[in-house]
């Protein structure tokens, strides 16, 4: 039986699924079985060309040998959320802006055959589990690859954070980010946090526009239980969101708990450039 390769496009970036269908033909010409499972818009008749067969995630996630994600970093993050129970690796083809998590550009599409043959470099990534506790009860839980963000909507909010019960920081400001090493090159970096190697196992705790001089980023061990309490929201609006998804609104004294997940994201790259090359090119000097 041939190996199953699942193509996970964002049809709003891969217009008409042009690149996806090229990848499908390329793989099938080399003896691989393929399925198309869009991350967004699977039922959008305008986004999915007539005659293209779409397969539900539930029918492929446990059988796939490799997932090829076609889109931007957001597409990869959404795919990782779908696949946090699957062990097959995930390779990205960049159709976004920075494309920091996607090692291939469309002009490198022929390399997906190499990846299907097992010629790739694995990159296991830490994920995080999130719980929102209100009045002693868990009312929301999620799992993310990048970060959990607690943020106000235009007004300062009061937050206090602990690690295993020890207070780390307490401040008023726009919010706080708890990022994984993968997420360290995203919102956390923009808020002044450090860049951390993606295969590392750490939490990066970064205040957002803290109205106090001493609120700095902390890098914590992965076995820490991070607790953040929303202490003063009142009539302001504040939310918690995981990997940029729609946020859940917070109320006074809500508690957000973040732990290292037992699940991991199994990304791969093709050895075309190192993490440091990508950082230099895509984040530091590309647009200068």
Each predicted region: which residue ranges?
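Glycine-rich phosphate/dinucleotide-binding loop and adjoining beta-alpha-beta core of small-molecule
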Residues: 69-95, 103-105
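Short glycine/serine/threonine-rich phosphate/pyrophosphate-binding segments
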Residues: 16-17, 74-79, 185-190
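ATP/nucleoside-binding phosphotransfer catalytic cores, i.e., glycine-rich phosphate-binding loops
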Residues: 150, 163-167, 216-288
